[in-house]
Amino acid sequence: MREHYIHMSLPPGFLEELRNRSSLSQVVGRKVTWEQKKTNIAKGDYWAPCPFHSEKTASFHVDDKKGFYYCFGCHEKGDAISFIRNSENVSFIEAVEILAREAGLTMPARDPKAQEKIDINKELASIMENAVQFYKMQFNGSNAKNAKDYIKSRGLTADIINTFEIGFAPGDRTSLSQFLLNKGIKENKIIDAGLAIKPDDGGNIFDRFRGRIMFPIRNTQGRCIAFGGRAMDPNARAKYLNSNETALFDKGRSLYNHATAREASGKANSLIVAEGYMDVIALSQFGFKHAVAPLGTAITENQLALIWRIHHEPIIALDGDTAGLRAAMRLIDLALPLLEAGKSLRFCILPL
């Protein structure tokens, strides 16, 4: 949806002119070595090992005349803009700006309404970064003893805690909200970011996350879009709680550790899909950085599409308990109609 507004914010014909004035083979050629035997420069027909997954054969094809690429291995496809976006790990508009500079085009002024939506998202992302820092600060404070004891019991090192920016939400109702209000952030923006709740009776807002270990969820551009929180109270109604859906966060279209795993997967030629945050973090500590987790009890079709974009045959690692086996069966039911050449699944059922 966000890309839709960015498209609208650019004048008609600008993206088409940008694509026409850009050489896809030059853009891609900075990232790959062309296979000389298969490549026919005169026809604009280029082949190389895919830059998005690990392979020895040249299955990545660029049609320079049409301006499109396609990988016959991992099925990654697109144009010069999408290639820059995915290979440089930048947003759509940042990719457009990079390509425009290379093509010698000046970026036009954008539509005010569409620009307003982009500015709102940037503001929410800034609020989320403030929350990340607040939770990290609280984790290092005296009120987080139980949280630190739990993390210590899981064997996590200081380095891995810092890498994943693990934090703590205090148990009182308004600690984060008050912190953000004191920074001049408006109440409605704190709610829009998914960090606070306004009661139905119109009373004062209160923090969504209280008494929880906090895990920032970042998108592929590295921006914090949501949080996951693990309750310290064994009697809490929900052991794990995610952010509600916001302008930044669509749970069914997001993965935990997506950006890092996508990069690491190319080197490892593998992808592990774990059950939750702690599984991904533990795997990373032991060198398996190519791991992601869904943000709920079941993998959605959109998440499965994201997973297959990272690797054509991911390993689904699930606990061998009843819940884990049920999750495996649900995923099998979801995946079976979608299986095709270059898209499959492997399952690793872990012992209890």
Regions found by a protein language model. Name each.
Residues I299-L352:
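Conserved phosphate-handling catalytic cores of large alpha/beta enzymes
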Residues F14-L18, Y70, C74, R85-N89, ...:
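Hydrophobic alpha-helical scaffolding
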Residues S54, H75-E76, A231-M232, M278, ...:
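Conserved nucleotide-binding/hydrolysis micro-motifs of P-loop NTPases
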Residues E94-A125, E129, S153-L156, L352:
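Amphipathic alpha-helical segments at domain termini/boundaries
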Residues M1-Q115, G171, S177:
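N-terminal structured subdomain of primase-like DNA metabolism proteins
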Residues I161-T163, F168-A169:
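Terminal amphipathic helices with adjacent charged low-complexity linkers/tails
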Residues M1-H7, N20-S22, A42, E116-L124, ...:
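Phosphate-handling DNA/RNA-contact segment within nucleic-acid enzymes
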